Curated annotation (Swiss-Prot):
Enzyme class (EC, first level): oxidoreductase
This protein's name: UDP-N-acetylenolpyruvoylglucosamine reductase
GO BP: any one term: peptidoglycan biosynthetic process
Record field: catalytic activity: UDP-N-acetyl-alpha-D-muramate + NADP(+) = UDP-N-acetyl-3-O-(1-carboxyvinyl)-alpha-D-glucosamine + NADPH + H(+)
Tagged with keyword Magnesium: no
InterPro entries linked to this entry: FAD-bd_PCMH, FAD-bd_PCMH-like_sf, FAD-bd_PCMH_sub1, FAD-bd_PCMH_sub2, MurB, MurB_C, MurB_C_sf, Oxid_FAD_bind_N
Any Pfam family hit: MurB_C
The EC number(s) this enzyme carries: 1.3.1.98
Keywords, sorted A to Z: Cell cycle, Cell division, Cell shape, Cell wall biogenesis/degradation, Cytoplasm, FAD, Flavoprotein, NADP, Oxidoreductase, Peptidoglycan synthesis
Species this chain originates from: Xanthomonas oryzae pv. oryzae (strain MAFF 311018)
NCBIfam families reported in the protein's UniProt record: murB, PRK00046.1, PRK13903.1
Molecular-function GO terms, alphabetical: FAD binding; UDP-N-acetylmuramate dehydrogenase activity
């Protein structure tokens, strides 16, 4: 393996990726570009070895399934600076580099007396990845607090600042997901209130707060409740390879949901993000089809949470992908509902 090191970036050849994805599957990058200072990005991308190569950005690798070796170059941002850049009477603007660990940012915001991100505690990944999927959990989504996304526009070869509207944030969607070849996120600015109405819609959070003796909850209490729940329900990727929730919760027209409920009266339904749509529980659908806790070789579904696909040891990305496809097919056959994966599939098609 040969390395090229310049000010602000490093390029490595034939780099193993097992430690850079939370499924812990084996894969190799032809080139691995590590960028420490975003200002060096244009120079790094012009390196002759990778100038015309496809580019895959990996944060902590918590939202990808490497079903094969990625083509071209893998890019990792190593800028991990966090700071409050503006104070106001009722809110503050926090800027975090793309390489900052997401949960570390949540804890930082709480330590600074800021709220808004507490429901998103312990989500694996980095700040640079959070706008791409518009990450969300327990009734909250990061898009509600994004002020500006700083990115390098590869089409125009310049750095740009995109406000929340320009990011086109939707349910697990954004302009960055729609145009993956265009923008490279280098930092995100968040508009975080000093006091925010707590989102306690999920019964599990209310029950956890009660067990903590925190009926008069603060944002930090909600974060701790979420941490407790996630640690009980979701396996630690450092111990058991996984990427959190593997499937999106399906959004369907209310008419289709009503027809399903007529046949499956115990099917849980939640409000959708838009009028006329409802949301089904992908976990419920998968469990009803008998997949929860099922294991084939080293590929399986967590016995604690039906949405979590796990690698018990040496399953390949291709084996995990085949397992996930069969889960989705069984749900389609029984309910006529199409499940879509949350992680990006690399090296194969869904």
């Amino acid at each position: 393996m040969s390395d090229t090191t310049q000010v602000g970036w490093q390029l490595s050849e034939h780099a193993p990726l097992r430690a850079l994805n939370t499924f812990h599957v084996e894969a190799t990058a032809r080139w691995l570009l590590s960028v420490h200072t975003p200002e060096a990005l244009p120079q790094a991308l012009a390196a002759p070895e990778i100038a015309d190569q496809p580019l895959l950005v990996l944060g902590s690798g918590s939202n990808v399934l490497l079903a094969g070796d990625p083509p071209g170059c893998v890019l990792c941002f190593e800028n991990r600076d966090t700071a409050i850049i503006a104070h106001h009477a009722d809110h503050a603007i926090v800027r975090a580099g793309a390489g900052v660990n997401w949960h570390a940012l949540v804890l930082y915001s709480l330590q600074q007396g800021l709220s808004g991100l507490e429901n998103l505690a312990l989500i694996p990944g980095t700040v640079g990845a959070c706008p791409i999927q518009n990450i969300g959990a327990y009734g909250a989504q990061v898009g509600d607090f994004i002020h500006v996304v700083e990115a390098f526009d590869r089409h125009h070869q310049q750095f740009v600042r995109l406000d929340a509207a320009a990011c086109a944030l939707g349910y697990r969607d954004s302009v960055f997901k729609q145009q993956p070849e265009r923008y490279l996120i280098v930092a995100v600015e968040f508009n975080l209130p000093l006091l925010c109405e707590l989102r306690l819609d999920y019964a599990g959070i209310r029950e956890e707060l009660a067990s903590m003796g925190a009926e008069l909850a603060r944002a930090a209490d909600v974060a701790q409740a979420v941490i407790n729940i996630r640690q009980r329900k979701l396996p630690d990727p450092d111990v058991l390879g996984n990427a959190g929730s593997f499937f999106k919760n399906p959004l369907l027209p209310n008419e289709q949901i009503a027809a399903l409920q007529a046949s499956f009266t115990d099917m849980p339904v939640y409000p959708g993000e838009h009028a006329g749509l409802g949301k089904l529980s992908a976990a419920w659908l998968i469990e009803q089809c008998g997949w929860k806790g099922r294991r084939e070789g080293d590929a399986g579904v967590s016995p604690e949470h039906a949405l979590v696909l796990v690698n018990y040891g040496t399953a390949s990305g291709a084996q995990l992908l085949d397992f996930a496809r069969r889960i989705a097919e069984s749900v389609r056959e029984r309910y006529s509902v199409i499940l879509e994966p949350e992680p990006r599939i690399i090296g194969a098609h869904w």
